[in-house]
Swiss-Prot record:
Active site: R22, N40
Gene3D superfamilies: 3.30.70.100
UniProt keyword list: Hydrolase
Protein name: Acylphosphatase
Top EC class of this enzyme: hydrolase
Cited InterPro entries: Acylphosphatase, Acylphosphatase-like_dom, Acylphosphatase-like_dom_sf, Acylphosphatase_bac, Acylphosphatase_CS
Molecular functions (GO terms): acylphosphatase activity
Family assignment from sequence similarity: Belongs to the acylphosphatase family.
Reaction equation(s) it catalyzes: an acyl phosphate + H2O = a carboxylate + phosphate + H(+)
EC numbers, comma separated: 3.6.1.7
Amino acid sequence: MIMASICTMAWVYGSVQGVGFRYSTQREALQLGVTGYARNLDDGGVEVLVCGEAEQVEKLIAWLKAGGPRSARVDRVLTEPHQPTRSWDKFAILY
């Protein structure tokens, strides 16, 4: 059975910069087998692109909404389906 592959863009707000949020997100993504990236935004948030099997993508989004790493404080997570302009073969931290 082939699982559907999807991509979701998430924007995470709260105390999420300078607390290892991108690295923890990358570690969680690698465990789930999803690809994409995490990068800090100028407005203090973190942008996360997650691509992979729908169930695994949803698990990472749920992890983000649950607060991510203990060092962070997540106030809100906005998500929308995304059609990437390129494919990702790993989960990267962008600068």
